[in-house]
Structure formats: structure tokens, C-alpha cells
Design a protein with these regions (language model features):
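Bacterial N-terminal signal peptides
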Residues: 16-25
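Long, charge-dense tracts
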Residues: 107-108
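CBM-like carbohydrate-recognition segments
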Residues: 55-79, 127, 132, 334-418
């Protein structure tokens, strides 16, 4: 009875209202934005991530100025030799589709023109043996990984980047791919790095060593576990490597094979369906407030975990159960949830080790500053023009937000059997 007395009851009411208000705003239920606003936010965040890297490397000063943060607090020789190629290759793969739209008279088009210039200048330095920023393609096995990511970037920007590079830089890139192709991959997702390099050589020159491609395809047929999940090797790992590497690179390789009349049509068609199903699962992982399960290794790649979902939107591979608008809104919620937390960037704008802010202890020994730029792959859908439905459609709730708010308009989830 005392607790329900008038005075204390008012206090409780005020406290409840304050808590409800904070929860309501924190979860973003009232924060609906237009596609135009979301696109501007994405461009701004991608620019913020890219600026320190490209502004330095375009002048040949990346190695001079980029920090090398590791879990130990000290860069080991392996990190120091490979982190710069990691940074360029990983930023490029996520940024390339947007750059490929090319410059135009809009404000965004002028921003793109600037980054096309910075990216080409950075690539010139990275592949020029006389540049202080010449990258390592031979020492340790890590260059295989990040050259493969770089290759994806090239394939995603053939007009605005590859064709605008000088013939000398193009020759230097092809020489680097030949060097990297000698690195032997381990029996895991690494097989796709070798396949990606060879597929890129096939696309750019018409020639390649077909064996690494055929071997990787054979292995991933064997390692398929069902419902769009591949093993990372013989075993299934509950992590995000199906999104970081496996689905994007496998589909890229298979598409190039089909383009050059090589490989099986049947497996290519199956992979397209599996890719769509995995994208569907990723969309359902996003909670009402933009959080998602933190599981498995390499979580320091932050929202790069959603590479497949963003790429599915770009390549028109979303399943019929979800709309482009709800993918845009869900991914925007994820990006905002991460970046609302302080500490993701250091005082000079470089990404820091962490998942939500600065958390060095969550980084594996193979992760350093350059590794973190794989987060850029969430921005892949920026390769869709502003007029596309992805950006022009009004705000839409994603599945997690719909179902937790009691919205009856939710589709059943169903596994695929192929």
C-alpha cells in the first residue's frame, strides 16, 4: 500500500516514463529515415573510413603514417609486412561498386570523382616497385588473401579503375598476380583466394592456371553442409566466413567460369540459390535495434559480416521474401549501431581493433589495422544508383523489427534443399 501511495507512485511513473523513452529512442523505433538520407549517411561513413588510408597512400605515405595495431600491442614482423596490402585490398573490394558508378554533376558524383582519383593513385603506388608504398606480394602466405580481395575490387570496377590505370600499372598488377599465384593455400576458405586470383587472370588476360579453380570448386561441393552453409574446410564453423569470403568469392569465380564457357552450369545455378538463401538468413539476424549475433572468429571486421546481404542487393539476388528497402533499413541500423559507439576510430581517423568501439582483446593474432578495412563490404550496395528501388523506396521494417513489434506481415522461414 505504501508503494502505491500518491507521492511515491508519481516518482515511479516518472522513472518508468524516462526508462521507456530512453529504450524507445535507443532501439530506433521512432527513427525512420528516407532512402536519400540513408544513402548520404552511407557515403559519409564510407568516406570517413577511407580517408586516412587513401589520402596517405595516394601520396606514397601509407607505410609512413598508418599505425599497425595488434592484440599484443606491438606489430610483429608478419603484420608489418602485410597490413598495408590488407588495408588497400579490403577497402577496395567494398568501395569498388560505388566507384564504378563514375563521376557526374551531382554532389555525390563529384565526391566519387575524388575517390576514383585517390584509389587509382593509391594503386599506382602500391604496385610500383619504386614507390615507398610498394606492397609485399611474396613474403608470408598472407598476400594471397588480400590480393584476392583486391582482385574482387578490380572485377567490380572495370571501367572506373582498371581501364583508367596506366598500361605500366596494369602490367605491374598482372605481374603481382602471377607472383601471388605461386603461394600454396591451406585446405580451407583459402582455396578460394587462389581460385579468385586465377579467375581474375582469366578475365583480364584470357589465360590462367585452371587447376586451382577446379580444385576449389570440387572441395566446396564436398564441404556443403546444407541450407546455404559451407564448411570452412571439412568442418562447419558458426562464424561469418560464408559472408566474408566463401559465398562472394565462390560466386565470382563461377560467374567468370561461365562467362568463359568453363565449369558446370548446374553448380553455378545452385550457388546463386544458396547465395540468396544465405542473404535471407543474414537479413533475419538483424535485431530491432541493429544488433546481431557476435559469434565466431574475425568479429573485428565489424559490419563486414553483412557482405553477402549487401552484395545480394547489388546483384539482384535477394529472395522474394524480403524487399530492397528492408535490407537498406536493416543494414543502416547495423552501421549506426556500430558507429554510435565511441572508439571505432583513433585520433587520426584510422580504424581501431574492436567490434563495438576499441576492444583490442577481441582481435586474433592474424588481425592488425589493415585487416579491419574488410568492414567496407557492407557498403557494396552503394553500387546501386540513387534511383534504384533500394534507395528510392520508403522506409521499411526489416524482419527482426517487424516480428518483435507484433507485425503480422512476416514471411515464414524455410530451409532450402539443394
Amino acid at each position: 500500500d505504501f508503494c502505491l501511495s500518491r507521492g511515491l507512485g508519481d516518482v515511479y511513473k516518472r522513472q518508468i516514463l524516462i526508462i521507456a523513452f530512453l529504450m524507445f529512442n535507443f532501439t530506433g523505433y521512432s527513427q525512420t529515415t528516407s532512402g536519400q538520407e540513408d544513402r548520404a549517411y552511407w557515403v559519409n561513413m564510407l568516406s570517413q573510413i577511407a580517408d586516412p588510408l587513401l589520402n596517405n597512400m595516394s601520396k606514397g605515405e601509407l607505410k609512413k603514417n598508418m599505425p599497425i595495431e595488434t592484440i599484443s600491442g606491438m606489430p610483429n614482423p608478419s603484420n608489418a609486412r602485410t597490413t598495408h596490402l590488407e588495408a588497400l585490398g579490403r577497402l577496395f573490394v567494398g568501395m569498388a561498386p560505388w566507384l564504378e558508378l563514375g563521376p557526374d554533376n551531382t554532389q555525390e558524383g563529384q565526391i566519387r570523382e575524388k575517390y576514383i582519383r585517390l584509389m587509382t593513385e593509391s594503386i599506382n603506388h602500391g604496385f610500383n616497385p619504386q614507390s615507398p608504398d610498394y606492397l609485399n606480394f611474396t613474403v608470408t602466405r598472407q598476400p594471397l588473401v588480400d590480393t584476392a580481395f583486391f582482385c574482387q575490387g578490380l572485377l567490380r570496377s572495370p571501367k572506373q579503375i582498371w581501364s583508367k590505370l596506366s598500361s605500366e600499372t596494369q602490367k605491374n598488377i598482372l605481374n603481382a598476380l602471377q607472383q601471388v599465384s605461386k603461394i600454396k593455400p591451406v585446405e580451407s576458405n583459402w582455396l578460394l583466394f587462389s581460385a579468385m586470383v586465377e579467375a581474375t587472370l582469366l578475365e583480364l588476360t584470357g589465360k590462367c592456371n585452371i587447376h586451382p579453380i577446379e580444385y576449389a570448386v570440387m572441395r566446396f561441393k564436398e564441404w556443403y553442409k546444407g541450407d546455404a552453409w559451407y564448411g570452412d574446410g571439412a568442418n562447419l564453423h558458426i562464424d561469418y566466413y560464408n559472408s566474408f569470403v566463401i559465398h562472394p568469392m565462390l560466386l565470382d569465380v563461377l560467374e567468370i567460369m561461365q562467362k568463359h564457357s568453363k565449369g558446370e552450369v548446374d553448380f553455378y545455378r545452385k550457388e546463386r540459390q544458396r547465395f540468396s538463401r544465405y542473404a535471407e538468413q543474414q537479413e533475419r539476424m538483424i535485431s530491432p535495434d541493429g544488433a546481431y549475433p557476435v559469434t565466431g572468429r574475425s568479429i573485428a571486421y565489424r559490419f563486414g559480416t553483412f557482405h553477402v546481404l549487401s552484395l545480394a542487393a547489388l546483384n539482384d539476388l535477394l529472395p522474394t521474401t524480403i524487399t530492397k528497402a528492408q535490407v537498406r533499413c536493416g543494414l543502416t541500423a547495423v552501421i549506426k549501431r556500430h558507429l554510435a559507439i565511441k572508439g571505432n576510430f583513433d585520433e587520426h581517423g584510422w580504424l581501431t581493433l574492436g567490434f563495438a568501439g576499441h576492444q583490442p582483446s577481441i582481435a586474433e593474432r592474424y588481425i592488425s589495422t589493415g585487416s579491419l578495412y574488410l568492414c567496407s563490404t557492407v557498403f557494396t550496395a552503394l553500387g546501386l544508383p540513387a534511383t534504384d528501388e533500394f534507395w528510392s523506396a520508403p522506409y521499411a521494417e526489416w524482419t527482426g523489427k517487424k516480428i518483435w513489434s507484433g507485425n503480422p506481415d512476416v514471411k515464414l522461414d524455410k530451409a532450402i534443399k539443394l
